Design a protein with these regions (language model features):
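Conserved flavin/dinucleotide-binding core of flavoenzymes
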Residues: 46-166
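Short secondary-structure boundary/capping segments
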Residues: 1, 41-42, 120-123
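Active-site substrate-recognition segment that forms the wall
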Residues: 3, 7-65, 77, 81-86
Length: 166
């Protein structure tokens, strides 16, 4: 399975996030209306809040000539959508007026359909190619912790390979 998204990353001022959801998933009908899949909130240690708006892709082709306009247009569309979407949470709605955009990016991801990819497939010593991510089976599968753990596991495998080569 593969997906392409436009993500708008926002930095919000200090917000009490105790009563806020960590993720807000939109229904299929709302996704169609707003062009957004979900909102992800990232509380920071200093009480600021990161907010990532996962916008849906419209299929527009990106070229060096079209990229600046596409970035501008998607950032504007996602900013308009998020202001409507956070209305039920007054703390978020109020903080959004002081939000600082960290930019918008288009990204794609491929994911296993039913389970994590076997960790045995993470490193190919013959080709000297390895990869890591949250879609590798194991502790933290499907979460940021899984991506970090798979990176540590890959680093260990590369180190062992390097030692064995010498």
């Amino acid at each position: 399975d593969a997906s392409v998204r436009w993500n708008l990353m926002l930095e919000l001022p200090k917000v009490s996030s105790n009563h806020l959801p960590r993720q807000i998933w939109l229904t299929a009908q709302a996704q169609e209306r707003f062009g957004v899949e979900r909102l992800v909130l990232h509380p920071q240690q200093d009480q600021r809040l990161g907010l990532v708006v996962h916008g849906l892709d419209d299929g527009a082709v990106i070229t060096p000539d079209s990229q600046p306009e596409l970035l501008r247009r998607h950032e504007q569309q996602l900013m308009e959508a998020v202001s409507d979407l956070v209305q039920p949470w007054s703390a978020l709605s109020n903080a959004l007026a002081q939000a600082r955009s960290l930019g918008v990016m288009r990204w794609g991801a491929a994911q296993p359909l039913h389970q994590g990819l076997s960790a045995d497939l993470q490193w190919c010593s013959e080709a000297r190619v390895g990869f890591c991510g949250d879609w590798i089976a194991g502790q933290g599968f499907g979460m940021a912790e899984g991506a970090l753990q798979s990176a540590l596991n890959l680093a260990e495998r590369i180190a062992c390979f390097s030692v064995a080569e010498t």
